[in-house]
Design a protein with these regions (language model features):
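Feature captures the catalytic cores and cofactor-binding loops of soluble hydro-lyases/lyases
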Residues: 4-116
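Phosphate/diphosphate-binding glycine-rich loops and adjacent basic-rich segments that engage nucleotide
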Residues: 117-125
Length: 125
């Protein structure tokens, strides 16, 4: 169970996230100045360059990575970071894709909890 940061928009990590602090520094993003360290980060879809995976990996190294990521549709740009983090640092960052209907239910939530064995996410408002 972890705090949720939710945005109804895409997100790029390269140039948007400070990998040393986990703070979102793009003043055009809905999560501007929010710190994702140890939180569940929900954004609609990834955008941007292949550097996203490297930023996530650096966040793991500095202890500033999100606890998990929720998307409508992930892609290799995001997935490479958690995959390499598992291999090099033995750190799990779950990446979950959910429906638009379920994604909308996350708006306003304070925390979420994953249950992989039941393929379920509990939402706490």
């Amino acid at each position: 169970r972890a705090e949720l940061l939710w945005a109804n928009e895409p997100m790029s990590f390269w140039g948007t996230v400070d990998p040393q602090t986990g703070v979102i520094r793009d003043n055009r993003h809905a999560l501007y100045q929010k710190n994702m360290s140890g939180k569940v980060l929900a954004f609609t879809t990834p955008k941007g360059s292949s550097g996203t995976g490297l930023i996530i990996l650096e966040q793991v190294r500095t202890g500033c990575a999100p606890a998990a990521i929720i998307n409508l549709r992930s892609d290799p740009v995001v997935l490479t970071g958690p995959i390499i983090a598992k291999r090099f640092y033995n750190v799990d960052i779950p990446v979950v894709n959910i429906s638009e209907e379920d994604y909308a239910k996350l708006e306003g939530a304070r925390e979420v909890e994953f249950f992989a064995d039941r393929d379920e996410i509990d939402i706490y408002y």
